[in-house]
Amino acid sequence: DVEPEGPVFSNASTLNADENQTAIGTVSATDPNGSVVTYSISGTDASLISLDTSSGVLTFNSAPDYETKNSYEATITAIGSIANTEQVLIINVNNLNDNIPTFPSSAIFTGDENQTAIGTVVATDADGDTLTYSITGTDLSITSSGVLTFVSEPDYENTTSYSATVSVTDGLTSLDQAITVNVNNLNDNAPVITSNATFSRVEGCVGIADCWDFGTVAATDADGNPMTFSVVTPDPPITGYDFEINATSGKISLRFSADYETKNTYTGTVTVVDSAEDGSK
């Protein structure tokens, strides 16, 4: 006995179809007996695909999304006059550039003063396309890969914040994001003593309270840091330092009642220190 021959498929077993549209393609088979072939569909994803039983035209019931489902499988049966033939059909969805890049990263950045580094702007693209970055403005710079820098080293005491607009493109679509870069204030300025280096008072300090009111060393710190005052070089030493200073206020006093006829000039060095720098006068 000779087994009956079924229809022979002429189409490939793998088809490709673009996302966002329903068209797939056509299956085609011929019957060796010359009869008209009809078609049916079954299998894993048959419920998602429509098949014209006469023409073999395949369509998605709804347009596919590559990012959701990018491959479908079904079994096509070609029905002949004597026998049938099955073909497992794979339909691969083509990924189109149909998604605009997005900015999941924060629009707020920080960078230390006195250096150019800031950080990296990060955008994503659901299509997996290569992204390219650009920026508007003159104070900030960005590489095509998103590395963000200051054009020149910032000084917190001059400018504390910068703004710009970053653009990202996937080659077809683009998106803008306004960003802000806040400058971190570092302790990069030494205190400056602003008061005169000479103080005077009437001899004969009566009681320690009057002695404390001899004068005050004034200083400023551009970084706004707390300052601490100290006496470092008494000259000449008389039972300890000739004078002392309040570490917080900078108020100075002799350590004893002054007598003009005994000594009328006292010299020493006062240092004012913040946490990292110092200045003296």
Question: What residues fall within each predicted segment?
Answer:
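Acidic, turn/loop-rich segments in luminal/extracellular domains of secretory-pathway
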Residues: 1-8, 13-102, 108-116, 121-192, ...
